Amino acid sequence: MHGTSAPALNVEQGVNLRTLNAFGLPAAAATLVRIDSEATLRRVIDHPELGRAPKFVLGGGSNIVFTRDPQAVVLKVEVMGRRLVQERPDAWIVEAGGGENWHDTVAWTLAQGWPGLENLALIPGSVGAAPVQNIGAY
């Protein structure tokens, strides 16, 4: 029987998290999975061991203060991509992956000639964390 199967999950063990948090605090993930798509996330959830384990979602690391190693599987959000979904006379609907850098995304919209987010430039974080982290305060 011939068929296509999804590639194995890239599960990393003993990952140093110092470069994945803005303060550079020492911490290590016993297990880390880089989430680059919705399909990858679904595969983690459906995995016999990873699916049952506690999860710790890590975005850009700008609002994380590690006081100890996470006691969970670290899911590093790395979903990338930006695109114009719809253009209206008074607005542009843009879709961006949760792993995209927020400031870079703001700069990209301005470079496309789509104003509106410029007052949110230079705020640290990722697009995926925007509603609940630094950007959500504005």
Regions found by a protein language model. Give the residues of each.
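Anion-binding (especially nucleotide phosphate/pyrophosphate-binding) glycine-rich loop
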Residues: H2-Y138
